[in-house]
Amino acid sequence: MAQGWAGFSEEELRRLKQTKDPFEPQRRLPAKKSRQQLQREKALVEQSQKLGLQDGSTSLLPEQLLSAPKQRVNVQKPPFSSPTLPSHFTLTSPVGDGQPQGIESQPKELGLENSHDGHNNVEILPPKPDCKLEKKKVELQEKSRWEVLQQEQRLMEEKNKRKKALLAKAIAERSKRTQAETMKLKRIQKELQALDDMVSADIGILRNRIDQASLDYSYARKRFDRAEAEYIAAKLDIQRKTEIKEQLTEHLCTIIQQNELRKAKKLEELMQQLDVEADEETLELEVEVERLLHEQEVESRRPVVRLERPFQPAEESVTLEFAKENRKCQEQAVSPKVDDQCGNSSSIPFLSPNCPNQEGNDISAALAT
């Protein structure tokens, strides 16, 4: 045999249990026996063994027996038939001298049955002469069964080996797949980590820039608020100062107007006291001449003022503008009043702001005419 027998498989044990002989008699529990009965049984067993060795009788399988062996007893006792042994008791004993166990069990049962009958002698007929051939057939059948069982065992072992190989192959393939999947997952995780790192770096830079931009915006907003407040304050200050300037100019114009009115009244009184009447034509000519002279003087003064402006401070330029506006107001206020006075009475002369002694000249001219 190439391989050692590893034992029955589960299927074989199940099959043996199913094919168990249904006619196997149940063993009776041995009852307590006396000393004499034990001695008798021993004697019967020895006698049966001697007879079995001499005759070479062996037990056969129940299906191989044509008829059960008949045993005869003396005339003193009625005959009794020995029970047929099942196939399980036909196996040879592995220890001893090659005697079958069926022969030993049969005398024991006979001894148990005959122990109740007393001291009667038992005579067993010798078996048939074909027992040796039948024994050989049984051995051949047992050998064939043994070989069949070994072949089945070998087939089962080969199947188990193939199954183990298939399982090992499947496990190796699964392990390779799992390793490949783990490698893919690791690579994907690395790529995701790299993307996360890039995004986090970009986000950090953008956040720093946003923080700096928010600080700059807050500073610019503060400056804008301050500038807006200053602009509003300056605008209010300008409006207030312009109102003050307008009020002052109006007040100056009213003062000049009142002064001119007083002068006109004074001149009228003087003319009435002297009984002097002025011609309207001469007065108109003198007024036109004075206007032309005044315009020429103003035009001659303008380039001088333009040349002097870059060297003048801001306060002087403001005072010059204020003086110009006052002059314009004076001219606007005086010119219509003088026209009215000339229309009403020809004795009122034209007063020029550039000629402080104009009143005396006018009076002397009026007296000369």
From Swiss-Prot:
Comp. bias regions, Basic and acidic residues: 11-27, 106-120
Q: Which residues lie in Polar residues bias regions?
A: 46-61, 82-93, 342-361
Where it sits in the cell: the answer is: Cytoplasm; Golgi apparatus
Question: Which stretches of sequence are listed as region Disordered?
Answer: 1-128, 334-369
Note the superkingdom of the native organism: Eukaryota
A Pfam family for this UniProt protein?
Answer: Transcrip_act
Q: Which UniProt keywords apply?
A: Coiled coil, Cytoplasm, Dwarfism, Golgi apparatus, Osteoporosis
Instruction: Give the UniProt record's GO annotations in the biological process aspect.
Output: hair follicle morphogenesis; non-motile cilium assembly; positive regulation of smoothened signaling pathway
**InterPro entries, per the entry:** GORAB
Coiled-coil stretches, from where to where?
A: 145-297
GO (cellular component) term, any one? Golgi apparatus
Region (Necessary for interaction with RCHY1) residue ranges read 188-369
Task: Give the multimer and partner information.
Answer: Interacts with SCYL1. Interacts with RCHY1 and RAB6A/RAB6.
Its family remark reads: Belongs to the GORAB family.
Task: From the record heading the sequence, give the disease linked to this protein.
Answer: Geroderma osteodysplasticum: A rare autosomal recessive disorder characterized by lax, wrinkled skin, joint laxity and a typical face with a prematurely aged appearance. Skeletal signs include severe osteoporosis leading to frequent fractures, malar and mandibular hypoplasia and a variable degree of growth retardation.
Q: What is this protein called?
A: RAB6-interacting golgin
